[in-house]
UniProtKB/Swiss-Prot annotation:
GO terms for biological process: translation. Coiled coil: none annotated. This is Large ribosomal subunit protein uL24. One of its GO terms (cellular component) is ribosome. It holds the Pfam family KOW. Keywords: Ribonucleoprotein, Ribosomal protein, RNA-binding, rRNA-binding. SUPFAM superfamilies: Translation proteins SH3-like domain. One of two assembly initiator proteins, it binds directly to the 5'-end of the 23S rRNA, where it nucleates assembly of the 50S subunit. One of the proteins that surrounds the polypeptide exit tunnel on the outside of the subunit. Part of the 50S ribosomal subunit. It comes from the Bacteria.
Amino acid sequence: MHVKKGDKVKVITGKDKGKSGKVLAAFPKKDRVLIEGINMVKKHTKPSNINPQGGILNVEAPIHVSNVMLIDPKTGEPTRVGYEVKGDKKVRVAKKSGEVIDK
């Protein structure tokens, strides 16, 4: 998967197209990511000990990883991600600027 937790990404398709946010969680087996403030859905909860009131909550839902692009740390524009072997480590590289993403 080309994005990891903590990356800044931009949504390129769907109802939140054009918005950007930070990746809160990545689910590689399902090819989905959870992005801060993106793909908000209403979740209905029953009253419980933790939430005695119950009600409707707004929570983020996962979005497919193909619908997001990583934001280039150098230019601030969305970019595709490539991989290079530097020394004995495989690092992610921004295709637009050639900037190494993994530090």
